[in-house]
Regions:
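Short amphipathic helix-loop junctions that connect adjacent transmembrane helices
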Residues: 40-72, 275-295
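Transmembrane alpha-helices of Major Facilitator/SLC transporters
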Residues: 83-89, 272, 295-321, 331-344
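Cytoplasmic helix-loop-helix junction between adjacent transmembrane helices
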Residues: 134-173
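Hydrophobic core of transmembrane alpha-helices in multi-pass small-molecule transporters
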Residues: 29, 116, 128-145, 264, ...
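Glycine-rich segments within core transmembrane alpha-helices of 12-TM secondary carriers
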Residues: 85, 144, 162-193, 213-217, ...
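Pair of pore-lining "gating" transmembrane helices in MFS-fold secondary transporters
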Residues: 11-54, 252-277
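Juxtamembrane intracellular "pre-TM" segments in multi-pass secondary transporters
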Residues: 2-21, 225, 229-261, 283-287
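C-terminal ends and interior cores of transmembrane alpha-helices
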Residues: 108-127, 333-345
Length: 345
């Protein structure tokens, strides 16, 4: 495996700032949560939810939020967040590269995501709700595209010795957040669709999660601004290159493209599981929306625990030293088995 090779002198001088690294890992967890938190509750929220029927009496009724919404459109709503993230990723990456700053791209992203989450919470006040939901999720995607800066920081702020651990834990944070997001929705199912009324607003099992996401985004901005200190132990300076104390390998384009492709497979499979689980189990087992969100949340909690355990093992044990190709083939085998078991034979 090609990697940056440092002289003993340079390696002794450089240290990974693990305090800032752990903050970056937690921020990746927050990004994962922001992306997936509605995956199981999105269709129930759109197809049948409590909202204001009469502004003067502030009377809430439960019926379809948007009668023109169908399951095909749900696919576009789910995709809109990923599309926004895809557009924003290179922008945040370019911003980070030009300014050598992670702090402000991350803060800006979370502020944009907070606006998107607040918009999602207030869908009941709008007409043409399905389009507003799509726009709200797209805006959230533009915000959480800041994960590009966070992932770059994991590489730039860690020494070659610590890089595997830093990237594994960062990936584990994102995977935990991505898997744990729907679990958060399931926690609030006891509120039901009617929820609690506060003036012109309603806190039910759908909207309270959105307000919580807004609070988490703003809290993340505060944490990054106050406690995050940028340290780039992994960057090779011009002086170090000139002294021949560092050996930097050529960029391996084919390997990078393969890794990007595999990452797409992982995310498509995970998204498929989380989005389809709620409507599928509702039909198969005749569950109520709240039951579907709750029980699928339990299943995903177990799944996320297993995923994080593997990421921790990869960064902390000898498993991380196993040939990377063998590790990828091992993981892909389970994705293939999932497709075989889920196929309607």
């Amino acid at each position: 495996m090609t990697q940056i090779i440092l002289s003993e002198k340079i390696e002794a001088e450089k240290r990974t700032d693990w305090r800032s690294m752990w903050i970056a890992i937690v921020m990746q967890f927050v990004v994962g949560v922001q992306i997936s938190v509605y995956y199981m509750s999105m269709w129930p929220y759109l197809s049948g939810v409590s909202f204001i029927d009469n502004m003067e009496s502030k009377k809430f009724q439960t019926f379809q939020l948007d009668k023109t919404a169908d399951f095909d459109f749900l696919g576009w709503v789910v995709a809109s967040c990923s599309i926004g993230c895809t557009i924003a990723n290179p922008i945040y990456g370019y911003w980070n590269q030009k300014t050598m700053s992670v702090k402000w791209p991350v803060i800006t992203g979370f502020l944009i995501a907070a606006v998107g989450q607040l918009w999602y919470a207030l869908l009941g006040f709008f007409g043409n709700v399905k389009w507003f939901m799509l726009c709200a999720r797209f805006l959230t995607g533009l915000g959480v595209g800041n994960i590009a800066a966070l992932r770059v920081y994991a590489a730039m702020a860690s020494t070659p010795k610590d890089r595997m651990r830093a990237i594994s834990f960062g990936t584990g944070g994102f995977v935990l957040g991505f898997s744990f997001g729907p679990v958060i929705s399931s926690i609030f199912t006891p509120l039901g669709e009617e929820g609690i009324q506060f003036g012109g607003f309603i806190l039910n099992m759908y909207t309270i999660v959105s307000y919580l996401m807004v609070l988490i985004c703003l809290s993340a901005c505060l944490v990054v601004y106050l406690f995050f200190k940028e340290s780039y132990a992994g960057i090779v300076t011009k002086e170090e290159k000139e002294k021949d104390e560092v050996e930097v390998p050529m960029f391996d384009i084919p390997a990078s493209l393969i890794c990007i492709y595999l990452f797409m497979i992982v995310n498509m499979t995970a998204t498929n599981i989380e989005v389809m689980s709620s409507p599928l189990t509702t039909v198969l087992y005749d569950w109520k929306d709240s039951d579907s969100i709750f029980y699928n949340g339990i299943a995903l909690a177990i799944s996320s625990a297993i995923s994080v355990a593997f990421n921790i093992a990869q960064g902390s044990t000898r498993i991380g030293r196993i040939d990377k190709r063998k590790q990828m083939l091992f993981g892909l085998t389970f994705f293939l088995l999932y497709q075989l078991f889920m196929y309607p034979w």
